[in-house]
Amino acid sequence: MILDVVPNHMAASDDENPFWRDPLRRAKFFDVEWRTGGVRRFFDIGDLAGVRIEDPEVFEATHAKVAELVREGLVDGIRVDHVDGLAAPARYLRRLRDAGIERVWVEKILEPGEQLREWPVCGTTGYEFANEVTALFVDPAAEEPLTELYRELTGDERPFGEVALDAKLEQARTTFEPEVDRLQAHLHGIEETFDLPAALASLHVYRTYVDPDTGEVDGLDRQAIADARLPPRLASLLTLEERGRDAFVIRFQQTTPPVMAKGVEDTALHRYNRLLCLNEVGGDPARWSLSVDDLHAGNLERLRRIPNQLLATSTHDTKRSGDMRARLAALSWLPGERREQVQRWRRLLAHDGAPDANEEYFIFQTLAGAWPIEQERMDAYLEKALREAKVNSGWLEPNDPLERRAKDFARRAAEHVAPFADRLSTAGDRIALAQTLLKLTCPGVPDAYQGDELWSLTVVDPDNRAPVDWARRRRLLAELRAGAKPTRETAKLFLISRALELRRRRPEAFANAYEPLDMGPHVCAFTRGETYVAVPVRPEASVEVPQGYCDVLDGAALGVVLAERDRGTT
């Protein structure tokens, strides 16, 4: 069991949190300057107060039970939520290790090309892998025609980086104005003025990890600050070339992650709708696709540096489930038909209260990827997506008439999109099975999100956090184990069960070995010891069990190959 630990914040509620309630009710007994006291928010949530986990006393008080559970063998390891929100992430992780907690995974968003720091952890929670195995199945040849289509429809020719920067700057100037004011207070006495919102928005990664206590500033931090092109004086403060503003450095580094998250994940990813499968937590929609060679290189690097990294395709925070992203990736396999269908739908629905072109295109893609989606779920998702985009509606000032029109438009559009979505599902399911097999066999620890054993076409929370019918899954698994042939409904469950059985049978093969095989650009194939894996990454490609291997999938027509060497073969 992996225990989820949230060290960064706690509920600031009188009724639910005695650590918060008791000091307030007994304020006269505490030596605290209440008029000037304040708390650090978690993101923009005032009811969640930041915890000073960097203080040894606070760490001991909050982690004694966690360490006890690990020592007693009741917990195998822990997952650290939002490690970037801590004042000193590296120091916190070293304290976990010193407390005897050795298996630690961190929820850390790495930008494409960014590497995890040399921390005492098993790895991240796997968003990088989720984005890689999505991009692997996006056809690079479709980038030009589908980008042209998006620009024609919306009239917006900005690259994603520009959209993201605008959204981050917007959030820094509005949502995080209190945090900016507190940062400014830490600069009291410096005559030079800085545009702190612009500085917070300019960082290309979630944060730097400069430690004022040790004076440690590594090359990655220096490069990140240089890439941000900050004013020289501000850069010198953040790289500790000029000392005396340690509190500012710490708080600045704690503030860039929420600016990035709210600006990119919760705003820009809802504004830039070129191909929605690329709009994922930790992803970069500017990166259109990933080659087989690049996936192999990433797998080899992971095996070398962090072999116990989690591999995810869906989590509680993903914008879309892995299966839905697979269907949307399949849109790149038929760019010509996609253009024709979109133009046809727009003609048919031109007078049905259509929202703006960008929102319209978002609705078409969502219906195609999540079909069949119940209207109630679609309505709830549209409301959230429109408000997160903050263009024509928002959480602070909801545009109820526009939201109603968008929901009505989606309801009418569904009947036109449905036949296309049904055809798309065949290719999408093929991609989803291939992604699932890669997650189960690539270097790392496969992480299965609840309910993902069967097809899951869900969108962001709360949709992806609905109750799971475990009884149904147990019944279907029992039938498969009793010899039932996999159907379309059970194909994914069958693949997962067979792959896990193989991992249990041959643990040594999945510990160290990984040998990429050159099967051309349209097939991803490799061996892990005596295990052979092959998946097609384009519709025209096919794979088969090689000579000298036994089919672990017993000939099931899943479009992928999982095989082990025939022990009778010499």
What are these model-derived regions, one by one?
Residues V210, T214-S332:
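Catalytic and substrate-binding clefts that recognize carbohydrates or anionic sugar/phosphate headgroups
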Residues A491, E501, E515-E544:
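Carbohydrate-binding surface patches
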Residues V552-T570:
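C-terminal beta-strand-rich structural cap/linker in extracellular carbohydrate-active enzymes
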Residues M1-F43, E72, H82-E148:
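Acidic/aromatic-lined carbohydrate-recognition and catalytic surfaces
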Residues D408-R423, E489-Y514:
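Amphipathic alpha-helical
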Residues L200-T208, G263-V264, N308-M324, I363-I373, ...:
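Conserved phosphate/anionic-ligand binding catalytic regions in large, soluble enzymes, centered on
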Residues A226-A235, R243, Q309-L310, M324-S425, ...:
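Extended, charge-enriched "interface" segments that sit outside catalytic cores
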Residues R35-V66, P145-E177, T315:
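Active-site cores of enzymes that catalyze phosphoryl transfer or operate on phosphate-rich substrates
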